[in-house]
């Protein structure tokens, strides 16, 4: 059976891990990094690049670079590049393809199965979108698991004692808090809460807004109108945020950020940690409510928590750590890597599903209540939040009007009392109900939530036995046909990328061969046959002429001709050198005088020790 990889598909960075020898290990990417920026870019030549290389060129190519796509998962948002629209699922699939390729290169085998993590507070449509992204990337997604739960697996797999832990997960774009009970290989989530629109990206934005404001006040320039300048600000803000985790002050120096009629504009700002904390104070404060909510839902006090795990790069910010200390009254546990533990946990879950890891049971919960709209626009909950999944719940409803033959089931997710204030997951109709006074027909609505947290709903008329069932696909979801089309496009893109890589490698080999030919001619021109020299010159010229043609077969053909010409010349030169050396050796031996007589002689070994 092929390996099951664990993927943390993050807002700003992603990570992939696998079980090796009973341990979860992080797989480094092709560039040698342990995490991969969740950045996709399209060059003007149509080449698609992902990861560190894409992030590096973002300043010069801001219009064709996509960042933080995870924030748009489960929505109708589209990215438009070169008159082609891409869904968040497709962009995410490109990141997953890169992680898959890096894993295959590391393992030396094909990878087809994965466990992918999502924020605990992701809605059904966001989870479904993540699963679709995996399919488009050519992966069978065995399980979607929550990021805090994955982190707890990475932390607690080798811990024997029973304990209650709180996972505070603040990443690039999302915030989650989960409370779990660990013991005897059982990881049971007691409560979860969060905010899907809060993370390190928002911290960066606050620094950017601050810098834009300074530039406007001091130079009268609005940088928001210049995409390239904003991309430079984004990179500088992220760098400053990271530096302020270890230093109390940092310098942001951006020369030639813009220009005015009076000349170029240079931005040179000293940002202190105190000022940074002032800029983000209200954002960090937004994590307090969900943390207290999770404690209340679990029926626990801060003193009942044995360990606090910090997950996600944004938890390195000192103000965040100080806030956690204030809420929970204890020092957070620093024993896990906040950037890697989620992927490691996903790999462990992959090991559980593949049968590699024994005696581990993961019991997760649904983060939001599920229900339907009933008379008067009321939201009637069928499954309360923090219910352990997988789960199933049914309830009997009736018609709202006399002789009603059709019932529309409006499925929602959320915590508000009125249907309009909650998130619509989908709608479907149960038809063919026999005419009857209102309140007489009995309609059973059944909810199923699978282990991935994905919802399935059915409605049945108990009088006629008629049933209608759907797996929720929200208005932002993809149809099976769309997914299949995207899978084919992704495969075609992967093939195009492979060919492009092959072209580059062939070109590099050709450049190297031309250089080798020039060195050989320089070294042996005086000793070689002129015909052989001419043949190399001709073959070299022909290879140089086809180099820009992008015709790989033609380039290889001309490389072969040049290689052959070089081989012929060097063989002859070395043979010639060998023959000359042999002739000189013979001459030296023949030059010694001999008298023609041969003498026989006896010899005796003398032992010096016995000499007298």
From Swiss-Prot:
Transmembrane segments: none
Phosphoprotein found in the keyword field: yes
InterPro entries: ATPase_NBD (IPR043129), Chaperone_DnaK (IPR012725), Heat_shock_70_CS (IPR018181), HSP70_C_sf (IPR029048), HSP70_peptide-bd_sf (IPR029047), Hsp_70_fam (IPR013126)
Residues with the Phosphothreonine modification: 174
Record keywords: ATP-binding, Chaperone, Nucleotide-binding, Phosphoprotein, Stress response
Coiled coil: none
Protein origin, superkingdom: Bacteria
One Pfam family this sequence matches: HSP70
Basic and acidic residues composition bias: residue spans: 601-612
Molecular functions (GO terms): ATP binding; ATP-dependent protein folding chaperone; unfolded protein binding
Residues covered by region (Disordered): 578-612
Induction info: By stress conditions e.g. heat shock.
Family: Belongs to the heat shock protein 70 family.
PANTHER family reported in the protein's UniProt record: HEAT SHOCK PROTEIN 70KDA
Protein's job: Acts as a chaperone.
Protein name stated in the entry: Chaperone protein DnaK
Source organism per UniProt: Moorella thermoacetica (strain ATCC 39073 / JCM 9320)
Gene: dnaK
